């Protein structure tokens, strides 16, 4: 038997992080009973985003063009390359108002339990970017979680022998913390106090 439209909507809403069956059911009923125009806008926005948004060819963040605005900006320092896990982390770095270099967004972290290794993260693309002859320093701004640390260690081991300077943001970011939840002042301090990796 095919699921009903309501069941399909509830199941679709469950794909969102932190949304379980009960929350998905409440959302579905709210959209259908109280906010059908909102449901239409939501559906249209999701469809538009899926059709228009892709990955930047240089930094791997989300963009509607081939190259994002940050990568296209002549005001950014091309000698600095900050590696972050997600676009949200990149936005947090921008909010510090202290970093004016370029970015590379991993779109994840090394997590063997989740089946994510260096190949799945596309670290070969990061390597190509870091060794382009322009980048002088790679700043690792992965989260201070076990997976973020493993990712930073792997990238350091990959780049250090190639002569690229590799630094890590300081531990102003709490151990086990994620950049998304760190205030911009703490993140700015961590960025200023970054350290050389691999020593």
From Swiss-Prot:
InterPro entries attached to this UniProt entry: DNA_Rcmb_RecR, Rcmb_RecR, Rcmb_RecR_Znf, TOPRIM_dom, TOPRIM_RecR
Molecular-function GO term, any one: DNA binding
Keyword Amino-acid biosynthesis: no
Keywords assigned by UniProt, alphabetized: DNA damage, DNA recombination, DNA repair, Metal-binding, Zinc, Zinc-finger
CDD domains, alphabetized: TOPRIM_recR (cd01025)
GO annotation (BP), single: DNA repair
PROSITE patterns the record matches: TOPRIM (PS50880)
Residues in Toprim domain copies: 79-174
Residue spans, zinc finger C4-type: 56-71
UniProt KW Chloroplast keyword: no
Source organism superkingdom: Bacteria
Segment forming the signal sequence: none
Pfam families: RecR_C, RecR_HhH, RecR_ZnF, Toprim_4
Alphabetical list of SMART domains matching this protein: TOPRIM
Role, per record: May play a role in DNA repair. It seems to be involved in an RecBC-independent recombinational process of DNA repair. It may act with RecF and RecO.
Family assignment from sequence similarity: Belongs to the RecR family.
Protein name, as recorded: Recombination protein RecR
